[in-house]
Design a protein with these regions (language model features):
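Sec-dependent bacterial lipoprotein signal peptides
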Residues: 1-25
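Structural signature of multi-pass, alpha-helical inner-membrane proteins
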Residues: 2-6, 27-178
Length: 178
C-alpha cells in the first residue's frame, strides 16, 4: 500500500527535474551571448508592375532611393567570411563568397555593369535592428568572389556585424557538414 510519503518522494524528484532547466538557464545568464547577423545583397532593378521590385533608402546622412529586386541574390549562406579592412579615409567591409556565391557575384556584376549592388545587414544579440549599409557601384565583372564596400555604419557597428556574420556563417557551414 502506498503512502503519502512515497508519493511525496516522487513529487520532489519531478519538482527537481522541472526546476533544473530554470537553474541551468539562470547560471548561463552571466555568459556573453554569441553575436549573430544576417546579410542580404540585392541588385538594382527597374520598377515593375509585377511587384518584384521595391524602392529602398540607402545612406542615412544623404539618403538616396534605389529601386531593387525584392529577392536577394546573395546571403550569409553564400559567405565564407567577412572582415573589416583599412581603406583610404577609414575602413571598408570585405565579403568573401563561396564557390556558388562567387559564381553569382560574377554573373550579376557582368550582367549589371553601371548599376548597384544594395547591401542590407542586421546584427546584434537579437538581430532586430538592421539597415541598408551600402549601394556599391558595379564598374566591372567581379570574378574573384570578393565584394568590398564602405558601409554606412560606425567602426564599432562594422566590427559587431563582422563578428555576427562570421558566427552565422560558421553555424550555417557546420549545419551543412552534419
Amino acid at each position: 500500500m502506498r503512502t503519502m510519503k512515497v508519493l511525496a518522494r516522487y513529487f520532489n524528484i519531478y519538482l527537481a527535474l522541472a526546476l533544473l532547466p530554470g537553474l541551468v538557464a539562470s547560471c548561463e545568464t552571466g555568459k556573453k551571448k554569441a553575436q549573430t547577423a544576417a546579410l542580404r545583397v540585392h541588385i538594382e532593378a527597374l520598377p515593375d508592375a509585377a511587384g518584384t521590385s521595391q524602392p529602398v533608402s540607402v545612406l542615412r546622412s544623404e539618403p538616396v532611393l534605389v529601386n531593387i529586386k525584392k529577392e536577394p541574390i546573395l546571403t550569409e549562406a553564400n559567405l565564407i567570411n567577412a572582415k573589416v579592412i583599412e581603406a583610404r579615409g577609414g575602413f571598408a567591409l570585405e565579403l568573401r563568397f563561396d564557390e556558388n556565391g562567387t559564381w553569382l557575384l560574377e554573373q550579376y556584376s557582368a550582367a549589371n555593369n553601371g548599376q548597384h549592388f544594395v547591401v542590407f545587414g542586421q546584427w546584434g544579440e537579437k538581430r532586430s535592428e538592421g539597415r541598408w549599409l551600402a549601394a556599391p557601384f558595379i564598374s566591372r565583372r567581379i570574378s574573384n568572389g570578393i565584394l568590398v564596400f564602405t558601409p554606412d555604419c560606425s567602426r564599432e557597428e562594422a566590427d559587431q556585424f563582422v563578428a555576427g556574420i562570421n558566427e552565422a556563417t560558421k553555424q550555417i557551414h557546420k549545419g551543412l557538414l552534419k
